[in-house]
Structures are given as C-alpha cells and as structure tokens.
Amino acid sequence: MKNLTLHQLKVFEAAARHSSFTRAAEELYLTQPTVSIQVKQLTKAVGLPLFEQIGKRLYLTEAGRQLYKTTRQVFEQLEQLDMTIADLQGMKQGQLRLAVITTAKYFIPRLIGPFCQRYPGINVSLKVTNHEGLINRINDNLDDLYVLSRPPSGFDITVQPFLDNPLVVVGPASHPLANQRGISLERLAQEPFILRERGSGTREATEQLFAAHNLNLNVKLDLGSNEAIKQAILGGLGLAVLSYHTLTSAGATPELKMFEVEGFPIHRQWHAVYPAGKQLSTVAATFLDYLLTESQRIAADIQIPESTTTDPELDAPQPVVGV
C-alpha cells in the first residue's frame, strides 16, 4: 500500500460513512467520477475490493471495514496532533464533535456560546438526536463527547454526571388539576398521557415509577419530540412527563404548567459520556472541564422544583438504568 494518499483516504472515509459515492462527492465538493477514480486507485493500492454493491446499496467488504476503522484512527490522530501543536503554541483551536440527546438542546447552546467566545479558535459540530440515534453514534465512535440522561448499558464507557435533570408532570394551565397540590399518583393514573417514544429515558423512568406503585399509565399517544408533546398537551390530548429543562428559557410556554404530584420530580442527571480508554483531544478535554464548571451556573439560574413526596425512597436520586 505504498501508493495510497491521504486524499484517497479522505474520499474513501466519506464514501464509507455515507455508503454513497454521490453523498461523499457532495460533502467534499467533488464530482462523482472523481470520487470513483480516487476509490478505484485506493482499491488498487490495497489489492482487495473495498466496496460491493447489492441492488442499489453500497456495502463495505471485510477489507473495506478494516480500512475504514484504520482511516478514522489516522484522521483522529492527525487532528489530535494539530490540537497539541496549537496548545503548545498557547492556543486552543480545532474541531469539537458533540452529540446530544434532543432534550439537551434546551441548555447545551447556553454552554456552547460562552465556550466559543472564550476559545474562538474552536469550531463546534453539534448533532441532536434521539436516544437510539445517540447510542448508534456512540457505537460508531463518531463524536468526541456525548450528552444524555441515561447512559447505555453494555458499553465500555466513561460517564461523568454534571447537571441535575428533574422530570416533572406537565399539563395545560387550564386543566382541573393544574392548581391542586399533592396530587396522588392514583389520581394521575386516571388521566391520559402523552409519552416519548419507546427507548426514551424519560418514558422508562415514568413507567418505572408507576409500576412501583402497581399503577398502569393510560398512554394516549407517543411522540418523538418534546415540542410535539407540548403541542399535543395544548391540543387537549393529555398530560406528559418532561425534563424540567424543557420548561425553562427557550422552552417556556405560558399555557403549560408543572403539576405538583407525589413522587415528582423524578431525579435524574445529565451525563457527559465517551468510550472508556479513549484519549480525549485537547479540545474535547477542555470542553469537558468547562462543562463540569459552567453547568453549575446553569443550575444556579434554574429553580429546581422540590419533590412533593413524603416517601424518602422515592425522594432519593434514582439509579441510572441501562438500555
């Protein structure tokens, strides 16, 4: 493989990641024939087929999978070298790849903004996705850091909690229960509920709480986004359990109200996660340190609701449950 080039590897990495020569060409601002030529030359240098086409889909061969894994490691090391040199020169610059669960979008931008002002040489790539999408990104090692409330089981990962994530009951301000205090779970179980999709940490925590009291949730609808759930609440379809962060700052909606229910809020935390043993880049390590410090500023700005339950076991922080 003496004749391969970094440019060929860059083209191959994009084609493998997208499973498409066309999308790779679009990303790299190249023509599709150019991508095909670069991959063909790389294939010749390797001496084994890198792709196989079945129907209209493009798949990596075993040689292609091994090369893709190695190629990503090569580019990660080159990025790390750039950051290390910049750090030695007294500068912080480079690329931060950050992936977060959808609910984190209500507070993460408030952290990224000041971070970028402090370190103008750092560019941030932020991906927002649901729980399943984030797990896939962790599995594929696509990012530097991941932010979610429920770290997955079955992964060898480093987990760093940094901010409380209380889950609260939300409903229309006009609802008959809106101004009541100490609403029982038994009474709440009579109401229709709108929940996040299956696999969501918020949904699982809610189902666990009701199951612990031998109560069934009346699930009227499940939706894949917090904003869709808010609109469904306003449409009179039911109540919901949401992260308190969705009701603060940019997520605030005057027509919605947090209900005072026994057993709520459910105590969870936000976690920064990355593969165990992974050497964080200078930029990623800088952001993680910043996250642990500045998250306390956000916590101070948010008045976290107190639990209304008299059961100390329910009032205690709940353990993180795996996927």
Curated annotation (Swiss-Prot):
Its main location: cytoplasm. Keywords: Activator, Cytoplasm, DNA-binding, Transcription, Transcription regulation. InterPro entries: LysR_subst-bd (IPR005119), Tscrpt_reg_HTH_LysR (IPR000847), WH-like_DNA-bd_sf (IPR036388), WH_DNA-bd_sf (IPR036390). Residues 4-61 form the HTH lysR-type domain. One of its GO terms (molecular function) is DNA-binding transcription factor activity. SUPFAM superfamilies: Periplasmic binding protein-like II (SSF53850), Winged helix' DNA-binding domain (SSF46785). The keyword Signal does not apply. Pfam families: HTH_1, LysR_substrate. Residues 304-323 are annotated as: Disordered. It is found in: Cytoplasm. The keyword GTP-binding does not apply. One of its GO terms (cellular component) is cytoplasm. Residues 21-40 bind DNA. Activates transcription of the cmpABCD operon under carbon dioxide-limited conditions. Belongs to the LysR transcriptional regulatory family. PANTHER family: HTH-TYPE TRANSCRIPTIONAL ACTIVATOR CMPR, HTH-TYPE TRANSCRIPTIONAL REGULATOR. This is HTH-type transcriptional activator CmpR. It comes from Synechococcus elongatus (strain ATCC 33912 / PCC 7942 / FACHB-805) (Anacystis nidulans R2). The gene is cmpR.
